[in-house]
């Protein structure tokens, strides 16, 4: 004789648009983006961060300036500067921080990604 057991259903995943800040865009990164936008002379630009296949670890980060925000893009604003992320990339970037660092070896945008299981030495590719 078998018994039918009703299991509780899982709560639906939160909509990324409803999460306060699913991705952190640091003040240092926003300041550098503002400087670069001023050099371009186009106040409509935002920095887009995205994930694509490639690199030595399977996925790699990409950055580009973009004037167009898609309806389903996440927009994170810091100090009046906007960072855009598409939903596909966001699933790999939830909880990450986009920062800008300067050191003796150079200056660069850095992503600190808690979802990355491994990263390559240059920090521009990762695996999940």
UniProtKB/Swiss-Prot annotation:
Similarity comment text for this entry: Belongs to the HesB/IscA family.
GO biological-process terms attached to the record: iron-sulfur cluster assembly
Description of how the protein assembles with itself and partners: Homodimer.
Keywords of this entry: Iron, Iron-sulfur, Metal-binding
Name the UniProt record assigns to this protein: Iron-sulfur cluster insertion protein ErpA
Positions annotated to bind iron-sulfur cluster: 56, 120, 122
Residues in coiled coil: none
Single GO molecular function: iron ion binding
Gene Ontology CC: cytosol
Biological function: Required for insertion of 4Fe-4S clusters for at least IspG.
Gene designation per UniProt: erpA
Cofactor annotation remark: Binds 1 iron-sulfur cluster per subunit.
NCBIfam families: iron-sulfur cluster assembly accessory protein, PRK13623.1
Annotated organism of origin: Xanthomonas axonopodis pv. citri (strain 306)
Cofactor(s) essential for the protein: iron-sulfur cluster
SUPFAM superfamilies from the UniProt entry: HesB-like domain
């Amino acid at each position: 004789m078998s018994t039918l057991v009703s299991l509780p259903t899982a709560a639906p995943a939160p909509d990324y648009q409803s999460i306060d800040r699913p991705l952190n865009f640091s003040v240092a990164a926003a300041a550098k983006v503002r400087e670069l936008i001023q050099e371009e002379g186009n106040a409509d630009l935002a920095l887009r961060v995205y994930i694509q296949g490639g690199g030595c670890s399977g996925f790699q980060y990409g950055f580009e300036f973009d004037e167009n925000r898609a309806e389903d893009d996440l927009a994170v604003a810091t100090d009046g500067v906007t960072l855009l992320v598409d939903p596909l990339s966001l699933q790999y970037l939830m909880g990450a921080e986009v920062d800008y660092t300067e050191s003796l070896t150079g200056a660069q945008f850095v992503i600190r990604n808690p979802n990355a299981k491994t990263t390559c030495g240059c920090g521009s590719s990762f695996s999940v």
